[in-house]
């Protein structure tokens, strides 16, 4: 990727939404609910505190995260639809080991 976010901004690749309902009905693209989870692609260096010291971010590239429904700004970078948001808009990090245990 040729994009580096500034300050406490984070670049997110939104997770793919469900294409079928639980009852087996195929959901068209314009009726799909946008997923509120995604993967962190890139992070900025961090924000500055009152003293001017750099405060690093809690998330890192590769983290699976949960964010608010209206969080972030949709952008297209290198032909890919991504989100850019501040770290404060991220609600939490999803533990991949727990997800893997559920799938097994």
From Swiss-Prot:
Subcellular location: Cytoplasm
Gene3D superfamilies named among the record's database cross-references: GroES chaperonin
Main location: cytoplasm
Gene Ontology CC annotation, any one: cytoplasm
Biological processes annotated in GO: chaperone cofactor-dependent protein refolding
One Gene Ontology MF term: metal ion binding
Keywords: Chaperone, Cytoplasm
Family, similarity comment: Belongs to the GroES chaperonin family.
Subunit structure of this chain's protein: Heptamer of 7 subunits arranged in a ring. Interacts with the chaperonin GroEL.
Function: Together with the chaperonin GroEL, plays an essential role in assisting protein folding. The GroEL-GroES system forms a nano-cage that allows encapsulation of the non-native substrate proteins and provides a physical environment optimized to promote and accelerate protein folding. GroES binds to the apical surface of the GroEL ring, thereby capping the opening of the GroEL channel.
Name listed for the protein in its UniProt record: Co-chaperonin GroES 1
Name of encoding gene: groES1
């Amino acid at each position: 990727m040729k994009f580096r976010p500034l300050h406490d901004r984070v670049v997110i690749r939104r997770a793919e939404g469900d294409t079928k309902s639980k009852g087996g009905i195929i959901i068209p693209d314009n009726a799909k609910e946008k997923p509120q989870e995604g993967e962190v692609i890139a992070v900025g260096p961090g924000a500055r505190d009152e003293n001017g010291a750099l405060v690093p971010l809690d998330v890192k590239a590769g983290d699976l995260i949960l964010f608010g429904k209206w969080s972030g700004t949709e952008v297209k970078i290198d032909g890919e639809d991504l989100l850019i948001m501040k770290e404060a808009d991220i609600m939490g990090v999803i533990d991949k080991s727990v997800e893997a245990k559920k799938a097994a």
